[in-house]
Each structure stands twice: as structure tokens, then as C-alpha cells.
């Protein structure tokens, strides 16, 4: 959800993580100060740990390392891979958004990213997407590379089958989970 009260959201998160096979939870909160992010992590990280779910912080490798998150996800406009890796160290996960670019994904992989993300595949309410990703990118990546890839952007139970068939290792779902009745 775009805005959350972590004390209330904690129960919703536990229910969502317990409802199926969830590989990771990414905390993405914008427009708040660092202390709010820290407090949110303090409340939600134990929920993910209790479910055996990897906890990834969006955009902030410094806070991911400081607060004990399992990793960080960075976009093309965030800290670069090398800076993120230096902050979180070799044991934590660093994932990189690559939009629809094979080149960006190969660079991220060569630098040592733990996964790459392609998208947005569908219209999304989570953020303004400036690129439209194509199934061919997933197909090519899954045929040529061993590094896991994540499909992002507007993914629902109804529109995800082609992404899985094209080779996405993971699906990032936001609204489909949090807007579900």
C-alpha cells in the first residue's frame, strides 16, 4: 500500500505472507523520513522473518544494512550497484531494476547483482512507469542467463501466465495482493 501504519499493517502482512509461496517482501515507502523507515522495518522485519520470507528494502542500501534487512532493490535512478553492494556487503541481496533493457541487465549481472527486474509489463498504480517491458526480454533472458529475473508492473493472477511461460523466475505483485478483498 502507498501509505501504511506499520502497527496495523503488521497483521495484514502476516496474513499475506502466510497465504502462499512468497519468495520476498519488498518494503517500498516514499516521502517519509529515515526514522519512519527504521520504525517501519523494526515492526515488519520480524513478521517476514517469522514466515521465512526475505525482506528487501527499496532504494536505500544504507538503511538496509543498518536495520538488518536481507537486501536492497535499486532502480536506475537510485544508488548504483557498486555503491549498494558496498553498503550492504557480500552476504545481502542486491537486485536491480533494468526496465526493458538487456544491456542494463547484463551490466547488473556482470557487476554481481543477485537478480534483475524487468518491467513494467502492465499498467500499474504503484508508480509511474516510463517503459513498457516486452515478453521477448524475459524469453531472451531466461534462455541466455542463469541469474534470476523478476517481472514487475501491474501483475495479477489473470495476466501473469504469459510472464511465467516467458521465463520470469519471480513475479512482483503489489496491488493484486493489497487490493484483494
Q: What is each residue range found by the language model?
A:
Residues 169-170:
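Internal alpha/beta core interface subdomains
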Residues 65-66, 120-122:
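Active-site beta->alpha loop and helix N-cap motifs at the rims of alpha/beta catalytic domains
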Residues 118, 150-155, 173-175:
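Glycine-rich beta-strand-to-loop/alpha-helix junction loops that act as flexible
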Residues 1-81, 86-114, 130-133, 140, ...:
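Conserved N-terminal beta1-alpha1 strand-loop-helix module at the mouth
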Residues 125-129:
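Short, glycine/charged-rich beta-strand-loop motifs at protein surfaces that mediate ligand recognition
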Amino acid at each position: 500500500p502507498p501509505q501504511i501504519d506499520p502497527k496495523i499493517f503488521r497483521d495484514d502482512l502476516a496474513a499475506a505472507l502466510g497465504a502462499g509461496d512468497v519468495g520476498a517482501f519488498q518494503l517500498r515507502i516514499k516521502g517519509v523520513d529515515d526514522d519512519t523507515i527504521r520504525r517501519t522495518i523494526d515492526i515488519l522485519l520480524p513478521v517476514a522473518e517469522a514466515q521465512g520470507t526475505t525482506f528487501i528494502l527499496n532504494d536505500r542500501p544504507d538503511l538496509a544494512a543498518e536495520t538488518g534487512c536481507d537486501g536492497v532493490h535499486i532502480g536506475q535512478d537510485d544508488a548504483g550497484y557498486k555503491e549498494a553492494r558496498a553498503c550492504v556487503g557480500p552476504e545481502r541481496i542486491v537486485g536491480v531494476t533494468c526496465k526493458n533493457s538487456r544491456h542494463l541487465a547484463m551490466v547488473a549481472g556482470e557487476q554481481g547483482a543477485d537478480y534483475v527486474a524487468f518491467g513494467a509489463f502492465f499498467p500499474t498504480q504503484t508508480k509511474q512507469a516510463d517503459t513498457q517491458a516486452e515478453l521477448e526480454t524475459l524469453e531472451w533472458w531466461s534462455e541466455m542467463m542463469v541469474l534470476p529475473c523478476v517481472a514487475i508492473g501491474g501483475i495479477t493472477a489473470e495476466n501473469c501466465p504469459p510472464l511465467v511461460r516467458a521465463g520470469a523466475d519471480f513475479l512482483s505483485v503489489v496491488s493484486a495482493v493489497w487490493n484483494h478483498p
